[in-house]
Amino acid sequence: MLIQIAISNSPLHDTYTYKIDAPVEPGERVEVNFAGRNTIGYVVSLEEKRGPFKIKSVNKKVDDRSFLSQVDLELAKFVMREYLAPPGKVFDLFFPPGKLLSIDDYVVAFSDELGFPPTQKDKFIKEFGEDYLKKLLASRKVKIMHSFDRKTPKKRKTRRVSLAKKTGIIEQELTPLWQIVVDYLLSVESEEITELEKKLKLRSRSPIDTLISKGILLVEEIEEDDSHWVIPAVDELSVSQKEVYREIMESDSKSFLLHGLTGTGKTEVYFKVMEYWLNRGRQILYLVPEVSLTPQLLARIRGAFPGRDVRQYHSYMTRVQRQMIWLDSVEGNVDILVGTRSSLWVPMKNTGLIIVDEEHDSSFYQQSVPFYDGVQAAIRKAELGNIPVILGSATPRVDHYHLTESGRISLLSLTERPVGSFPTIRVIDMKDEKNPIISKQALEEIKRTVSEGKQVFVFVHRKGYSNYVVCYTCGKTITCPHCSVSMTFHRNDNLLKCHYCGHRSAIPKVCPECGSMTLSARGFGTERVEHDLQKFFPSTKIMRMDRETIDNPIAYEKALLEISRKNCQVIVGTKMITKGLDFPDVEMVLIVDADRLMSFPS
């Protein structure tokens, strides 16, 4: 048999002809020799005709079955055709990175008469011979079953420290650094070591390690559980939400655009539709544009669907984690899969509904080969599978809004908030303010909000302490030697950092241009705003959320947990605090230096 093969990880736009003796299906993975090396290939199609040329044979089959359905194959062809994407790169999307979990073949008897338990195929052949196995298979007394060698991903572990005893500490002789650590731990039960280093701004872990070795501190290793955070579900839909749900369930259309302003309850409508399909044994694919949106969403889904298997899938996970979730999704063990655009390609066994939240977001566009639009691919996948797809946004894409007028997509609208009213927006003129960063009125509102037990979000569009360092004498701005852009001053690290390439350098003592000592840090970022607010409100707990303090999804989820538990009153952050977060005690949002945002591209 001749087959057309797409070469894995190849930028080439062609498929290649190989021959194989074993039965094979489109979508299966095989090993082939291509350009002098053995590599993975994907069976794209089967052929009967043989050309007048020598054809290579396939080395071996990799999986013994195709993981891809007809819908997956048609979706791959759509992406190849629509975005001129290389076939091998497109098929790579459907599989997790790295070598897929190994598959063991087992010989399983149909009855107990043969008197042996399920046995690995290789061991069976070694003990009884291959001819005997063929005889049993031909007489249908045994069958071959596949079992995946599942690696158990390591659970995250954190190390927390606490005082061995809180009495008698004062009498001990402590160095200044040790005293800082002890004073802090006198006010709390325990603290994670990495967090303790950050909060106390320690240059190294040495003071903590020394206190542990002296027996003053106790250390405890705790295994973390990803599923602790649960947000209780909303009991009942509002009248307008029920109307939208009814339209979805009664419509002949399969594609919907749910246009609803922030806070109108689009998520509750999603959950109601999800409930319908889950009760019918179907799987749900829930797409979000960024990893940062998954922690709180997962907590809400767990609260709405207790007992359901809810997983997340994104590029920040380890290879083993992604492979395990991929495999469980393929086998139909996952009820709800939440993830970024990469989760669109997981070949789920029984998908019944696709939800694309924040469908307008540019993060759904793949910016590297193979290029594609994740939202358009999701719509096409739903059409191929004849299942509903719901696109949700407060600011829908223009082209999708146009499709609602032509009838290809049904438009649904939510205009009323189920709880509360839309916020009052005040614009404060900073011309006459003494403080160039935060107005007197804003400070008074923060004080009032915090005193009432509520929380405040402060959005700053740049991280760091100061945007640039300039020489007053000659006007020279300190720039990155690699990028020629101004370097940002970070006060906590006492360094200049380039936010483009990551280059770091110490602050020069004199101007590199004229030799003057009149260097000054100008502008501000999250670090400066946090510093100023802490001066105004010394007893208020302030958290900063930017790429300096939150550098991975685990840290982000921990920060959200701190906010939900009200362990901080004021949260200062960059755009990571502006997307999809919903905390009932946040009563005030402050946008610092809003003028600068007006000239930014959207």
Model regions and ranges:
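Inter-lobe coupling/hinge segments of SF2-like helicase ATPases
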Residues: A233-K242, K254-S602
